[in-house]
From Swiss-Prot:
Protein's recorded name: NADPH-dependent 7-cyano-7-deazaguanine reductase
Main location: cytoplasm
Any matching Pfam family: QueF_N
UniProt similarity note: Belongs to the GTP cyclohydrolase I family. QueF type 2 subfamily.
Native source organism of the sequence: Aliivibrio salmonicida (strain LFI1238) (Vibrio salmonicida (strain LFI1238))
Positions contributing to substrate binding: 87-89, 227-228
HAMAP family registered for this protein in UniProt: QueF_type2
Length: 281
């Protein structure tokens, strides 16, 4: 359990509560969670040790055109890591559902509405693009870059989070290495529902022991935090224990409620070069 599980800022969230689905546009459904909750726990100050963003995919986006004809689209949202708030995912789903029986004059009107409302919730301007389903169907399914570290012949007997797996985990050999794992699993901070993800770690520096890194990632298995918070924890722990010259951590989570969240944190890159789906997405 994280130190901020019972924070006042979390008590009013619709997450974990029985809720009524709205069918007409209602921006007030969006709920913000201060990023400071997790960052204070990580002892991060105003000068963040990373840049990056949260990339959301909206698979259940529908509204009515001026003739009442339903429209459907798939949306991409890029939320800056510098925003004071993250958007709580259940409230995001409820907000999108409120579009279902609402008439919009154009696709551009939908896009501008999403940008306006999400920017207010996040506290910083977000980027939004929506795509016809036919156009999005051309996007390939890919694997993460680099070497997969999952197929190691090791015994795992602990699933409690422990950053100390990374202690003394580097050698003197200097490398520029890309690693990934599909074994990332954590639990929702509020509901304890499992969150399934894959994570890619791209770094330059002293070589990180693959076994210790995998044990560290597996230790998230019973850990309760939001997706974005887990990725920031991974980034800060690797920086603390391994001290790479450069580091990028990119996780892609499976969708829930028609949304997937893909947090990206880097020492030098604002956003991922490509936003491509994995097999489980």
């Amino acid at each position: 359990m994280t130190k901020y599980t019972n924070a006042d800022e979390l008590k009013s969230l619709t997450l974990g509560q029985k809720t009524e689905y709205k069918h007409s546009y209602e921006p007030e459904l969006l709920q913000a969670v201060p990023r400071s909750l997790n960052r204070d726990d990580l002892a991060l100050g105003d000068e963040l040790p990373f840049v990056g963003c949260d990339v959301w995919t909206l698979y259940e986006l529908s509204w009515l055109n001026q003739n009442g004809l339903p429209q459907v689209a798939i949306g991409d949202v890029v939320l800056p890591a510098t925003s004071p708030n993250l958007v709580e995912s259940k409230s995001f789903k409820l907000y999108l559902n409120s579009f279902n029986q609402t008439k919009f004059s154009s696709w551009e009107d939908v896009t501008s509405t999403l940008i306006k409302d999400l920017s207010v919730c996040a506290g910083e301007e977000v980027m939004v693009n929506i795509h016809p389903v036919q156009a999005y169907s051309q996007q390939p399914i890919v694997d993460m870059q680099g070497e997969c570290i999952d197929n190691q012949d090791i015994v795992i007997d602990s699933y409690e989070f422990d950053a100390n797996y990374l202690e003394s985990s580097t050698s003197e050999k200097m490398v520029n290495e890309v690693l990934h794992s599909h074994l990332l699993k954590s639990n929702c901070l509020i509901t304890n529902q499992p969150d399934w993800g894959s994570v890619e770690i791209n770094y330059e520096g002293n070589k990180i022991d693959h076994e210790k890194l995998l044990r560290y990632l597996i230790s998230f298995r019973q850990h309760n935090e939001f997706h974005e918070q887990c990725v920031e924890r991974i980034y800060t722990d690797i920086m603390k224990f391994c001290s790479p010259k450069s580091l990028t951590v990119f996780a892609r989570y499976t969708r829930r409620g028609g949304l997937d969240i893909n947090p990206f944190r880097s020492s030098h890159l604002i956003k991922p070069e490509h936003n491509l789906r994995l097999a489980r997405q």
